[in-house]
């Protein structure tokens, strides 16, 4: 799917160099097609890197996607130029009266921070409740899953004793589910989190359907029956070197991190790892866009039909 982005966004040239189909706003405006409107709430500090990762996964299907980037943390960023944020990101007040086909809420490095201490926790509440009336389907990733389970289902924050980091095998529980259509029976996906997602807790306290899980990671992929909410507790968007960068950052900071599981060749951090989850990530996002967004969203977004309580 050609993603439609502002002509000047740095991701345009970055992704084109990887042979990813990116359509600028100028070209897209000449096509008589309604693009899917997808809002990306980017909570990661290195926003440009995260943009590249998610836009790569949103790019491989035949329909246009009009990407809009959202920020809710107005503090000065130490990792992203203010010019970039001002040029390419919108504030919630700018979009609160608009409707969207899809919303993606990224992870955030807040695994050991209590929800009440998150600087933008009230804004997260506001966006999630706003999405009930204004978004066809929302996809939560990693920390955003934990936040959504707390806000929407009242599940307290669950924290692991040590950080889960590495590339893990997962098993499909419902092979005929739309979100896992085309998945291998077992597949690899990366994780990097302190958050814990016990499958039993989700089954006992929500009506969400779990589609994939792992003995080491817990629930990995689950969703609401009406397809309005989808949750992925890992990081299928990660580049091949993202876990490596996190490991070496923590090592150099003297944090004595564990070597990510099943990631570095021979468990040697000096050897360059290779991505073993790329096809899974592409298929997951394609399925979400097709079955949870495109197939159920109205042609005219003014005619939203919210079903969330």
UniProtKB/Swiss-Prot annotation:
The record marks 111 as: Important for acyl-CoA specificity. It catalyses: L-homoserine + succinyl-CoA = O-succinyl-L-homoserine + CoA. Its main location: cytoplasm. Substrate binds at residues 163, 192, 249. Keywords: Acyltransferase, Amino-acid biosynthesis, Cytoplasm, Methionine biosynthesis, Transferase. One of its GO terms (molecular function) is homoserine O-succinyltransferase activity. Its EC number is 2.3.1.46. It is found in: Cytoplasm. One of its GO terms (cellular component) is cytoplasm. One of its GO terms (biological process) is L-methionine biosynthetic process from homoserine via O-succinyl-L-homoserine and cystathionine. The record marks 192 as: Important for substrate specificity. The keyword Transcription does not apply. The active site is at 142 (acyl-thioester intermediate), 235 (proton acceptor), 237. Pathway: Amino-acid biosynthesis; L-methionine biosynthesis via de novo pathway; O-succinyl-L-homoserine from L-homoserine: step 1/1. InterPro entries: Class_I_gatase-like, HST_MetA, MetA_family. It comes from the Bacteria. NCBIfam families: metA. Transfers a succinyl group from succinyl-CoA to L-homoserine, forming succinyl-L-homoserine. Belongs to the MetA family. This is Homoserine O-succinyltransferase.
């Amino acid at each position: 799917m050609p993603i439609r982005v502002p002509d000047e966004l740095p991701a345009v040239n970055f992704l084109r160099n990887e042979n990813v189909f990116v359509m600028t706003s100028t070209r897209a405006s000449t096509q008589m097609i309604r693009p899917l409107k997808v809002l990306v709430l980017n909570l990661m500090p290195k926003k440009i890197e995260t943009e590249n990762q998610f836009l790569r996964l949103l790019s491989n299907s035949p329909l246009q996607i009009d990407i809009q980037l959202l920020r809710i943390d107005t503090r000065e960023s130490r990792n992203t130029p203010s010019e970039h944020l001002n040029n390419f990101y919108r504030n919630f007040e700018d979009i609160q009266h608009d409707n969207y086909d899809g919303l993606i809420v990224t992870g955030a490095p807040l695994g050991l921070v209590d929800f009440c201490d998150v600087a933008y926790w009230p804004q997260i509440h506001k966006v999630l409740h706003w999405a009930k009336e204004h978004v066809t389907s929302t996809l939560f990733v990693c920390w955003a899953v934990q936040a959504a389970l707390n806000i929407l289902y009242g599940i307290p924050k669950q924290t692991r004793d040590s950080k889960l980091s590495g590339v893990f095998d997962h098993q499909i529980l419902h092979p005929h589910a739309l979100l896992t259509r085309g998945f291998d029976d077992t597949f690899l996906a990366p994780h990097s989190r302190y958050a814990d997602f016990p499958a039993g807790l989700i089954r006992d306290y929500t009506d969400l359907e779990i589609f994939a899980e792992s003995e080491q990671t817990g629930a990995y992929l689950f969703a609401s029956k009406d397809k309005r909410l989808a949750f992925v507790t890992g990081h299928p968007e990660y580049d091949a070197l993202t876990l490596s960068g996190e490991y070496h950052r923590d090592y150099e900071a003297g944090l004595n991190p564990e070597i990510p599981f099943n990631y570095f060749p021979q468990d040697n951090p000096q050897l360059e790892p290779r991505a073993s989850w790329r096809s899974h990530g592409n298929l997951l996002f394609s399925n979400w866009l097709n079955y949870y967004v495109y197939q159920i969203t109205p042609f005219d977004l003014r005619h939203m039909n919210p079903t969330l309580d």
